[in-house]
Design a protein with these regions (language model features):
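N-terminal beta-strand/alpha-helix entry module and adjacent surface
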Residues: 1-118, 124-197
Length: 198
């Protein structure tokens, strides 16, 4: 199901967060469950599709902002970066010091005002299931309700977001793609294209 929505909603957040704006120009992908609303910026989605079109296993980090209002978790994924120092495999997912150094260097250079929202993983030929290694890696490094996992699964390149619920990772069912000016991600992509082929 794809739906294009043009609206300007202002949501009241709980705590000290104040108000936040939902993106105006969005497109829904899949059926969302209502408890989480994941907004993926279009440049980020384009980058992840291209990066994960390679035949080898790859991982990336997701950056942006997390908000909570009226019992709903809002993930605004504004940026993503390839993790070049990691060699993911279905039975081997290591977030060592080299990975975190790379991630924090990228954050410092391109995405200073954003937080880590989770990670993305592509394991071509492995299938759609989340094995114990994937779940353990997520819970060890991205535990909590404010982090997500984005998987690109199988031959059809099915895109699925997962969040922590009930002691494990569960699919959110769908997400939203939104469109806005995204200079930090554009700068990252320009530098990546100049330095290496993705």
């Amino acid at each position: 199901m794809i739906e294009i929505v043009y609206k300007e909603n202002k949501e009241q957040a709980n705590g000290n967060e104040g108000y936040f704006h939902l993106p105006k120009n969005i497109r829904q992908v899949g059926d969302t469950n209502g408890r989480e609303r994941i907004y993926l910026e279009d440049y980020v989605g384009t980058f992840l599709k291209k990066y994960f079109s390679a035949p080898e296993e790859r991982a990336a980090m997701l950056f942006g902002e997390f908000k909570w209002a009226d019992g709903i978790s809002y993930f605004f994924i504004r940026s993503a970066a390839a993790i070049h120092t990691m060699e993911p495999a279905p039975d081997h997912l290591v977030f060592d010091d080299a990975v975190w150094t790379e991630v924090h260097d990228v954050m410092e250079k391109y995405f200073k005002n954003q937080q880590i929202l989770g990670w993305a993983l592509s394991l071509p030929g492995y299938g759609e299931d989340l094995n114990e290694q994937i779940i353990r890696a997520h819970l060890n490094h991205f535990g909590g309700n404010d982090k997500t996992l984005f998987r690109v699964n199988g031959q059809e390149k099915e895109e699925t977001f997962y969040t922590y619920e009930g002691g494990t990772l569960r699919s959110t069912g769908g997400f939203y793609i939104y469109y806005e000016k995204n200079e930090p991600m554009q700068s990252y992509l320009i530098d990546q294209n100049q330095n290496r082929s993705i």
